[in-house]
Amino acid sequence: MKAKRCVCSPGYIRQGSLSRRFTREEFQRLTDEERERLGLRTLSSAPCTLPPAKPAGSGEGLSVEGLTCAFQKREAVFRELSFSVRPGEVVAVTGPNGVGKTTLSRCLCGLLREQAGTVRLHGRPLGRKERQRAAFCVMQDVNHQLFSDSVWGECRISAPDAPDEKIAEVLDRLQLLSFRERHPMALSGGQKQRLAVATALLSEKPVLIFDEPTSGLDYARMVEVSGVIRDLARQGRIVLVVTHDQEFLQQACDRVLHL
């Protein structure tokens, strides 16, 4: 029996329907402007041109000095890590899988105890409990941090005293206001991710850590999240972003920490 060859071609789905089909050559010839208008991500990965994170210091911001962390009491994932993030900066944390990016984020927000080293905020050393009060982490799997029975209720947990207008403004910006009564577990993966970003924005905590915040997002939603993170920095927040997304990194971040 002669085997049949299956040839797949890219298609563009809009509002749940296939609205356009491309040949491979047509798809590769799309200009950046056309691709962005369609909400598609880049096909190429440009090298990172951002400057490195600043060394540890005693001034304003978050300073990490000689940090050593292990996961589940195993051998240290990284040793004597030092860097700083100033208010108004967005620092990307990048590196191969397994080098400790998520471990670092969990340690900085007080979910994991360090083996050695010091974490300072505005020059003052922070213990684990103090870091839990000062930092908010949006996890890569946001299902572990959505607890309410509605989108609105989830935001209210993070900001119990916020005016309704403020919550509505944040949800509207992230294209979630029309889902305000929806159960978080009934949202799509990208919508859950944006809801977690909304709760971080509303938390008013000075240190915000995002673990792969653009995972699964198309170009338009990635730009929205990038804009929100830039706004947080302009408000004087200290922002770290764990990411493999080079397109997002170049749009949203000021410096990069390579692990």
Region annotations inferred by a language model:
Residues G117-R131:
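Conserved ABC transporter NBD signature motif
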Residues D164-F179:
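Conserved ABC ATPase "signature" region
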Residues T94-P96:
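The feature captures the beta-strand-to-loop junction immediately N-terminal to the Walker
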Residues C109:
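Helix-to-loop junction immediately C-terminal to a conserved catalytic motif
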Residues L208-D211:
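Catalytic Walker B motif of ABC-type/P-loop ATPase nucleotide-binding domains
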Residues D218:
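ABC-family nucleotide-binding domains
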Residues H183-L187, Q191:
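Conserved ABC ATPase signature
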